[in-house]
């Protein structure tokens, strides 16, 4: 469950290490975002020479959340950290690698490129 001012780890190789959620996309009064939801964020920490730099405003899709999510079969999925992948306007990732597992919900929300780059889909 991600909301405004939430800080997330970046799970790709764009050069950003941490982002801060500015807005949850998908409705005027939408407060929370989960796995597979798109947010607008600002880069809070980045490595020198990366594709993005500190202060850039980016779109990102959430790939891991600490808050458990119930699935249709009754099982729950939960991760150890909140993480996101920075995306372009056409929902393709800006980086070329994804680090760590991602949720299966990304496949249902048509983020196929992220699913194919991820080392593990849980």
From Swiss-Prot:
Pfam families: Ribosomal_L14. Part of the 50S ribosomal subunit. Forms a cluster with proteins L3 and L19. In the 70S ribosome, L14 and L19 interact and together make contacts with the 16S rRNA in bridges B5 and B8. Keywords: Ribonucleoprotein, Ribosomal protein, RNA-binding, rRNA-binding. InterPro entries: Ribosomal_uL14 (IPR000218), Ribosomal_uL14_bac-type (IPR005745), Ribosomal_uL14_CS (IPR019972), Ribosomal_uL14_sf (IPR036853). The gene is rplN. PANTHER family: 50S/60S RIBOSOMAL PROTEIN L14/L23, LARGE RIBOSOMAL SUBUNIT PROTEIN UL14M. This is Large ribosomal subunit protein uL14. GO terms for cellular component: cytosolic large ribosomal subunit. One of its GO terms (biological process) is translation. Belongs to the universal ribosomal protein uL14 family. The keyword rRNA-binding applies. One of its GO terms (molecular function) is structural constituent of ribosome. It comes from Mycolicibacterium gilvum (strain PYR-GCK) (Mycobacterium gilvum (strain PYR-GCK)). Binds to 23S rRNA. Forms part of two intersubunit bridges in the 70S ribosome.
